[in-house]
Amino acid sequence: MIVRIGIMALRLCVLLALIFGILLWVNAIPDWGVMAHMTLGLLAVISLWLLAFGIATAPKGRNWGLAIGAFVLGLLLPIVGLGQLSWLSLGNAHIVVQIIHLLLGLGAIGIGEMIAARYKRQNKLA
């Protein structure tokens, strides 16, 4: 049950954070969008860690590699995201940081889906 809830929350939070992030990138929403994006990102990281906990403590098919990978990715995502605020002085190189943050976010949904699929396969959830 923890994996089902975790993957649904992760999907929703990453999708909404991605939408807010793109709108922020093109300056289409006001400054409150930053806080909404950060809140959704935090919820996505918590969901990812919930999935990591689920696969690490699964009765069958434990996978420590996926769990550790999800935990590390969950740490990197806000570090790079919050780091953007202080790295704005990089000028044109700032776009590289934005792209890295975007790729980490997409990686979060990817590893979350991998965890959910592995858990379902190993534990025969419908």
Feature names for model-found ranges:
Residues 1-126:
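Polytopic transmembrane helical bundles with strong interfacial aromatic enrichment
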